[in-house]
Amino acid sequence: MKLRLKIPALWWLAAFLPAVSPLAVAQDAPPEEPRRYFRYSLSTIDDVTVYSGLQVPLPIVLNQFLVEPTLTFRYKPVWSFSTSLIGVADTYTDSFTQLRVKEAYAGASAGNFDITVGRRMVRWGTGYAFTATGVLDPPRMPTNPTDRLNLNEGRDMVKADFVHGSSALTAAWSTAALAPASADLHDTTAFRYNVLVHGFDTSLIAGDDRGGDAFGGFTFTRVFGEAWEIHGEAAWREHEAILGGAKYTTTNGITFIGEFFTPPNIPYFQETSTPLNGRQHYLFLTAGKSRLRELPGWKQWDLSVSTVANLNDLSYTAIIDATRRFGNHFSSYLHMEVPAGNSRSEYGATPFTAATSVGIRFQL
């Protein structure tokens, strides 16, 4: 009698298991990516800069109000479009408003190939405050390497990428037709080969500026554990330019960055209005910490101190940055620059003794 009861039970169990298994597999399968993806953001900055000891006949207060909307749209994994605009209202010697296009590009992907057309910001150089190989990058400003007002704009280009395993090949052509005349840009053709070799992220870069010079370069980045990183660049454009740097993060979250940069004395690398004699040598040092302490009232603070120095004329600029966050959307900041040096030196010739910027940022 007991045997008769067990046999039907086994039949029911055998019939039920095949029905359950596909259900379990379906529940374990990752969800499919949406066919359409849309994301937008909005940020505003109200910035006031006060110049102390101004040595030229200009107002001592500069006020800027910036609005930056950004949106990204993707259809399937193939098509994409992204744009980032910035509206600037400036009150200084005169009041004016302008609209800048930071980025506006469309992209298509097919297998290992990606094609991008439009204005795009890229970062080929590995340097934090300087770069020798960032031929298509926005310009680096050593006293403001993070671009705190988000004023950098991309280059207008057609770019194609081919990725295979741990290597990638990029070909880009950039036009200067839509760039401001003050930017002093040329039509640029550039190639970049990136590959990971024994833990070193390396790149070979080559190209040519129309009406200018051909150039070539090499970059590398290497991370050691969770604390150390080294990076470097070497480039040739009429003469050699060398950059070397390192980053170290302590166990309590303090980050130190140091860079040494020596460019040749040619117009491409000379960003100052004062003519410089011969090859220059620069040093950049910074120490900073996000979330000063994991305690209420402290973890909302970020603080960093930096200095950039010209080792030839011994002039320098000291920089202090402090940020205080209020919730998820608001933050305030302080940015101060104090130049020092002989009046005929690079940083000593700065026409003020200090520039102090304070601002409020809103992000949505």
Regions flagged by a language model, labelled:
Residues 43-64:
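Surface-exposed strand-loop-strand hairpins of Gram-negative outer-membrane beta-barrel proteins
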Residues 59-67, 97-102, 111, 152-156, ...:
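Residues that define the transmembrane beta-barrel architecture of outer-membrane proteins
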Residues 77-81, 112-115, 166-171, 197-204, ...:
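Repeated loop/turn-to-beta-strand initiation elements of outer-membrane beta-barrel proteins
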Residues 283-289, 336-338, 350-364:
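Outer-membrane beta-barrel "beta-signal"
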